Amino acid sequence: MATAVLFDLDNTLYPYPPCNQAGKAAALERAQELGYDFDHESFAEFYQAGRREVKRDTGGTAASHERYLYFKRALELHTGSPRPGDALALGDAYWSAYLEEMSLVPDAKETLEELQEQGVDIAITTNLTTTIQLAKLERLGLTDYVDLVLTSEETGQEKPASVMFTLPLARLDSRASEAVMVGDDLEADIAGANAVGLETVLFDPSEESDATESADRAATERQADHSIDTLGELTDLVS
């Protein structure tokens, strides 16, 4: 039986796409209120321009996901001058709507409760900045079930870097051979955890048909020790 389970957060314990969509819609609305002449298409181009530059400059760090940076850089490119107040306003609008849209995937809380009752330590290991990841956990109501939270901002490296797995194990006094990693990302979560000896579980609730799955993805999925499409399946694997 596992002594510790490490979970990814984004798109594992809650669905990411609807939250991101809600955040962008709110940021567009706020930009229009501030007097920017954006429609959906032009705002998408504006957002992607900022995102692209930030990822180019900060790739491999928690900052590469920071929406305030995306909006800051996008506004600089769009206006030719710093607009700190507007960048804050767009970032605030994005994250407020994002958090409001969040909801747990089915069986998430029940699974965490059962693991907790079995005496299994639960850690979150996640690629993003600490402030927003803590806000997400609060919003989802998961703080009572989690023994440890580690963000890539704390380590200065992102999954699949080994420190994102070895550090939580060290803090929980657990060995890799006794731990399980659960996540949706084949490279960051599965390959990274495999490299340090954890048992790996790919969480893929999409249930895409064989007709739409590429041979490359099917081959890559074999990197995971297990693949599940509901979190409720996890407790049988761990016990």
From Swiss-Prot:
MF-aspect GO terms: metal ion binding; phosphatase activity
Enzyme Commission number, as recorded: 3.1.3.109
Active site: 8 (nucleophile), 10 (proton donor)
Keyword field contains Ligase: no
Family membership noted in the UniProt record: Belongs to the HAD-like hydrolase superfamily.
Function, as annotated: Phosphatase involved in the non-carboxylating pentose bisphosphate pathway, a nucleoside degradation pathway present in some halophilic archaea. Catalyzes the dephosphorylation of ribulose 1,5-bisphosphate (RuBP) to ribulose 1-phosphate (Ru1P). Shows a strict substrate specificity toward RuBP.
Keyword tRNA processing assigned: no
Description of pH dependence: Optimum pH is around 6.
Cofactor(s) required, per the database record: Mg(2+); Mn(2+); Co(2+); Ni(2+)
Details of cofactor binding: The cation specificity is broad, with similar levels of activity detected in the presence of 1 mM Mg(2+), Mn(2+), Co(2+) and Ni(2+).
Species of origin: Halopiger xanaduensis (strain DSM 18323 / JCM 14033 / SH-6)
Name of the protein in its database record: Ribulose-1,5-bisphosphate 5-phosphatase
Domain of life assignment: Archaea
Residues binding Mg(2+): 8, 10, 184
